[in-house]
């Protein structure tokens, strides 16, 4: 009994000292349908606000940051990040040469995916540092092309960190959500 008590006290001490890494709580993990909804909402917001809406997208405390995800926006034609709440150092910078840890040109792929189906957008898989985790994880990002005043082809995107979902599965979800008869909430 003394051994069990000592083990429990040691575990408690480790938890209090922050020596263990807790897995994210399910409520703290963004889902693909949330990413799609946030991207569509942000695209509509930018259509209404124009370039002045980028300031809201850049805010870490704004409506476009939730759980472990965030909306960001970039201009493929001008090769520039236009809004990124977690990486303000990227705003205004060239993006086409940015690669993930596996050498994938992330933004080139996102530009292709978002432009391939302008009415639906598309998904890209890559590895990226997860906010708050400090480690690289598999990420699926949904990107959707929108036009705003004086600027065409702005890509609005958000991602989810997931080791199980396939691009095919999230693409089917996008199709379902884009059809109001099947998904009346949108």
PLM regions: where:
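N-terminal membrane-sensor/transducer module of prokaryotic signaling receptors
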Residues: 2, 11-186
């Amino acid at each position: 009994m003394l051994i069990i008590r000592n083990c429990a006290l040691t575990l408690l001490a480790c938890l209090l000292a922050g020596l263990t890494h807790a897995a994210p709580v399910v409520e703290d993990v963004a889902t693909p349908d949330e990413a799609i909804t946030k991207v569509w909402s942000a695209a509509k917001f930018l259509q209404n606000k124009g370039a002045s809406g980028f300031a809201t997208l850049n805010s870490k405390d704004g409506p476009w940051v939730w759980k472990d995800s965030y909306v960001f926006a970039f201009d493929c034609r001008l090769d520039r990040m236009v809004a990124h709440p977690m990486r303000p150092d990227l705003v205004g910078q060239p993006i086409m040469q940015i690669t993930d840890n596996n050498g994938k040109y992330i933004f080139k792929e996102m530009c292709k995916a978002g432009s391939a189906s302008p009415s639906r957008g598309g998904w890209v898989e890559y590895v990226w540092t997860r906010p708050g985790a400090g480690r690289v994880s598999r990420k699926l990002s949904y990107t959707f092309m929108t036009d705003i005043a004086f600027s065409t082809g702005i890509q609005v995107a958000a991602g989810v960190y997931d080791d199980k979902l396939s691009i095919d599965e999230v693409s089917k979800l996008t199709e379902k959500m884009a059809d109001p008869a099947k998904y009346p909430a949108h």
